[in-house]
């Protein structure tokens, strides 16, 4: 089993939601208006100097095949995102 976190700019939420539906993922926990800064990326703090927020979705996978589909879909979405800072990030951990 694996636990995945996907972090992305809030403006990409519709694309991410549609992608999850397309691959059959209808289970997750979501945090909205998440503030933060990634390695070599712009901060998203919801204020004037650092506008915008992130959204984070946590998804537990019993089957790694579904996680692999998600990874493929995120890579597909990232291929059309223009700014490196705006790419979707996926982090995965073992889950017991």
Question: Model-predicted segments: where are they?
Answer:
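Positively charged, small/polar-rich N-terminal and surface patches that mediate targeting and assembly
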Residues: 1-96
């Amino acid at each position: 089993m694996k636990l995945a976190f996907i972090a992305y700019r809030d403006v990409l939420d519709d694309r991410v939601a549609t992608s999850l539906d397309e691959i059959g993922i209808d289970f997750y926990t979501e945090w909205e208006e998440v503030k933060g800064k990634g390695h070599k990326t712009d901060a998203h703090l919801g204020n004037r100097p650092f506008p915008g927020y992130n959204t984070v979705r946590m998804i537990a996978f019993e089957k790694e095949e579904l996680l692999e589909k998600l990874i493929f879909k995120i890579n597909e979405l990232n291929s059309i995102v223009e700014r490196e800072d705006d790419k979707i990030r996926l982090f995965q951990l073992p889950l017991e």
